[in-house]
């Protein structure tokens, strides 16, 4: 009987390979979590409101105003969402016709663009970035624009840590000005703020930006993100968003995090993580099992190893959880390592050094 009921699910959902989140893969295993690009330290914010018997505002005005000040945009250009992930989904639901329209995404990159397209039976076109430089392949994007409504660009990119050329982004926006929305996912932009595209929202009506409080703001646990776009696009998304997407505790904590004092603390954490990243890269360069370290502008690094599977498993057994990227296009033998505290990074280095000395006759 249960098999008959399962067949009631949409065919594309039955076939769907779900997104493998860090928690879904790793659960609570280990004590050093370097697999989800989270902040290694928590922030001291608290939920102050006590009245929880009323439904929350669909779009909390105070929170939108605070974020508008932070990004220097108008309040009517901002939508609050349950993390940037909801923004990815809303755009597909609002703009793509099932079985007719398509999206483009550029692997190796964040998988939720593809997963959401599959959920809603939207065709997805993969246009890989140029190997090793990870820049956009504009020629192949142009050749694949037929029926494409949305183009997702993660910048800085997860998992490579690279940034797109701004000229390429401008060229892409010009190329698709009247035909497609270019969605720039800026989840990690606080680590390289000068690369943000917010200044160009007025010039390019087809530009949409996704933001989150999960990374530099160290608030992954509250699930709060934002869509930044022209007010007309925000109005469309407001038509289909859940009636009460942002809980009262989430809105309260998010609002507090946008106070100027907490923004300064966030910026200081970014400086610390950037320094830890440089330290970690310099230490990894001296280890014989490391084949290549890709340049990163974020709170994680992509490293190609000799014996990557064995190193991944060894770290797992030692309670150090990193993200295996070997299955992704052009990322053979690559592991993605979140930059942790100095103590966590030191422990990681010691374990890899010990492994290398034992099995590769290296340092």
From Swiss-Prot:
Belongs to the class-II pyridoxal-phosphate-dependent aminotransferase family. Histidinol-phosphate aminotransferase subfamily. NCBIfam families: hisC. SUPFAM superfamilies: PLP-dependent transferases. It comes from Buchnera aphidicola subsp. Diuraphis noxia. Keywords: Amino-acid biosynthesis, Aminotransferase, Histidine biosynthesis, Pyridoxal phosphate, Transferase. This is Histidinol-phosphate aminotransferase. The modification N6-(pyridoxal phosphate)lysine is found at residue 215. Its EC number is 2.6.1.9. PROSITE patterns: AA_TRANSFER_CLASS_2 (PS00599). One of its GO terms (molecular function) is histidinol-phosphate transaminase activity. GO terms for biological process: L-histidine biosynthetic process.
